[in-house]
């Protein structure tokens, strides 16, 4: 993968980058999580209204359409949408986009290297917590990274029918993951806290990764509930059987997890398994349920 050269950041941009390294990421995130859970009545409703106006949140598509319907900011932030607000592409060979947001990057995994943003790449091994067997499954495959901004719907859904086989919690940094920082913080997604979910599908293995960030107070899944806090200090691996009472089977378009405040989702596909939609480019807005690509069966 050949990378182009880009202009050096300005002094103002360098200061912004330096602040990310110096600020107390964990304490800010813990404080944001505590505040987001407060139930302060009219104060909470005022904050939600200000936030919705600033970020142009479309509450009309949510099940609860008024700020006063939400007891806490977190309840507002992970608001469910009305039924059919996000139609799921029903073509059996179609993959669906997992989240609302914007494409950060996408394309081919060059041997074991993914493009983070212009001028930066990172390896499968570091992203996947040095699980070499897992990384080998996706060499020369495809990937897509979706950035969820504060205005977006923050539940994450399945691109296809799948069975959960492994979940890996990886402790890490809590850098912001906005497009500017993605361009200037090396190995951003491979150094941030993240939750790696490996699934078995009709076309082979698939990975969906929830990446934490500054003030992303918690991540959750539909099968295990809230993963953090508390934040473990070591990598934790959970294996799942494909059959039996504890098996986790999810349908295309079904919810699989959520962020309490925004972050990023990364999907990995094996070599030759899928073709990503040609119109999808970095910066392209995404809506959950729309077509991500075609399964090669």
UniProtKB/Swiss-Prot annotation:
Residue list for modification Pyruvic acid (Ser): 263
Keywords annotated in UniProt: Cell membrane, Decarboxylase, Lipid biosynthesis, Lipid metabolism, Lyase, Membrane, Phospholipid biosynthesis, Phospholipid metabolism, Pyruvate, Zymogen
GO cellular component: plasma membrane
Pathway(s) per entry: Phospholipid metabolism; phosphatidylethanolamine biosynthesis; phosphatidylethanolamine from CDP-diacylglycerol: step 2/2
Cofactor note: Binds 1 pyruvoyl group covalently per subunit.
EC number: 4.1.1.65
Site (Cleavage (non-hydrolytic)): 262-263
Enzyme class: lyase
Modification after translation: Is synthesized initially as an inactive proenzyme. Formation of the active enzyme involves a self-maturation process in which the active site pyruvoyl group is generated from an internal serine residue via an autocatalytic post-translational modification. Two non-identical subunits are generated from the proenzyme in this reaction, and the pyruvate is formed at the N-terminus of the alpha chain, which is derived from the carboxyl end of the proenzyme.
Catalytic activity: a 1,2-diacyl-sn-glycero-3-phospho-L-serine + H(+) = a 1,2-diacyl-sn-glycero-3-phosphoethanolamine + CO2
Cofactor needs: pyruvate
Broad class of the protein's primary localization: membrane
UniProt cross-references to Pfam families, sorted A to Z: PS_Dcarbxylase (PF02666)
Membrane topology: Peripheral membrane protein
Catalytic residues identified in the record: 100, 157, 263
GO MF terms, alphabetically ordered: phosphatidylserine decarboxylase activity
Subcellular location: Cell membrane
GO biological process, one term: phosphatidylethanolamine biosynthetic process
Subunit-level organization: Heterodimer of a large membrane-associated beta subunit and a small pyruvoyl-containing alpha subunit.
Family: Belongs to the phosphatidylserine decarboxylase family. PSD-B subfamily. Prokaryotic type I sub-subfamily.
Function recorded in the entry: Catalyzes the formation of phosphatidylethanolamine (PtdEtn) from phosphatidylserine (PtdSer).
Protein name: Phosphatidylserine decarboxylase proenzyme
Species per Swiss-Prot/TrEMBL record: Glaesserella parasuis serovar 5 (strain SH0165)
Lineage: Bacteria, Pseudomonadati, Pseudomonadota, Gammaproteobacteria, Pasteurellales
Gene: psd
């Amino acid at each position: 993968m050949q990378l182009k050269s880009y202009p050096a950041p300005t002094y103002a941009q360098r200061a912004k980058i330096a602040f990310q390294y110096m600020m107390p990421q964990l304490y800010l995130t813990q404080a944001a999580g505590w505040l987001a859970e407060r139930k302060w009545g009219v104060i909470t409703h005022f904050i939600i209204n200000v936030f919705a106006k600033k970020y142009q949140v479309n509450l009309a598509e949510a099940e609860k359409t008024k700020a006063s319907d939400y007891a806490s900011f977190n309840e507002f932030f992970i608001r469910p949408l009305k039924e059919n607000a996000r139609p799921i592409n029903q073509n059996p060979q179609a993959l669906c986009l997992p989240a609302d947001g914007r494409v950060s990057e996408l394309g081919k995994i060059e041997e074991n290297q993914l493009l983070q943003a212009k001028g930066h790449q990172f390896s499968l091994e570091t992203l996947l917590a040095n699980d070499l067997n897992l990384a080998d499954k996706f060499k020369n495959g495809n990937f897509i990274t979706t950035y969820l901004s504060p205005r977006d719907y923050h539940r994450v859904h399945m691109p296809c029918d799948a069975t959960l086989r492994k979940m890996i919690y990886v402790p890490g940094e809590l850098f912001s993951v906005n497009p500017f920082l993605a361009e200037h913080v090396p190995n951003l997604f491979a150094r941030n806290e993240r939750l790696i979910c490996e699934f078995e599908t009709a076309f082979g293995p698939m990975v969906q990764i929830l990446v934490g960030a500054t003030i992303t107070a918690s991540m959750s899944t539909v099968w295990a509930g809230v993963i953090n806090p508390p934040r473990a200090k070591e990598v934790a691996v959970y294996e799942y059987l494909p059959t039996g009472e504890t098996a986790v089977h999810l349908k295309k378009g079904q919810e699989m997890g959520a962020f309490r405040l925004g972050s990023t989702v990364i999907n990995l596909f094996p070599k030759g398994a899928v073709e990503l939609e040609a119109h999808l480019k970095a910066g392209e807005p995404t809506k959950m349920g729309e077509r991500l690509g075609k399964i090669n069966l």
